[in-house]
Amino acid sequence: MAAAAAAAAGDSDSWDADAFSVEDPVRKVGGGGTAGGDRWEGEDEDEDVKDNWDDDDDEKKEEAEVKPEVKISEKKKIAEKIKEKERQQKKRQEEIKKRLEEPEEPKVLTPEEQLADKLRLKKLQEESDLELAKETFGVNNTVYGIDAMNPSSRDDFTEFGKLLKDKITQYEKSLYYASFLEVLVRDVCISLEIDDLKKITNSLTVLCSEKQKQEKQSKAKKKKKGVVPGGGLKATMKDDLADYGGYDGGYVQDYEDFM
């Protein structure tokens, strides 16, 4: 019996040992082993990458929220520019209005000069309004020819004068051309000094004298052509008949005998 009990106790101890030995590998694998630790470390890195993606999304949202603020600031700048232009335009209009109501120089002007001065100031006001509208809406028209010129030197004004002359003289056949020039010259000379006006007047006087000489010479030539030597109408008729003498010489001879 003692032997059987000892054998049974031995079997029980061996079973416990086997059970303990089986649990050890499981504990080693499930514990802090190298392979298990590496796998979890990789998963931790994946979680870090996910956090970075969230950061990118947050940055994009922040940028999207910042952009409207920039647009608002730009609109404010544009509005301020427009207000400044309006203030300048209002100031110009007040100055022009003041000049229209009260002339700066206390001088006596003829009704024509007063009208020309008012028209000139009105034109300046219209040009100022147009310029303000262009600047407000960002209009930039490309112009050529006379409108594109901005003369400053003598050569520039010479070229400008040629283009202007070609532009105006193309209407010289019009019935209203002379009266148009009269008004134009007076309007463009209204702001000149007396000495400059005298120079222009002298130049026009010389031109008028030359035109008169040419007209007299032309009339003298016409009178010479109208004089018929040797008998007036009789000689003229004789010459006309002589033109037919080549075909039949009897016409001229019969005419002389008859006379």
From Swiss-Prot:
Composition bias, Basic and acidic residues: 61-107
Covalent link (Glycyl lysine isopeptide (Lys-Gly) (interchain with G-Cter in SUMO2)) residue numbers: 107
Region listing for Disordered, in residue ranges: 1-111, 218-247
Region (Sufficient for interaction with EIF3B): 1-70
Localization of this protein: Cytoplasm
Family of the protein in this entry: Belongs to the eIF-3 subunit J family.
Protein's name according to its UniProt entry: Eukaryotic translation initiation factor 3 subunit J
Species this chain originates from: Pongo abelii
Gene assigned in the entry: EIF3J
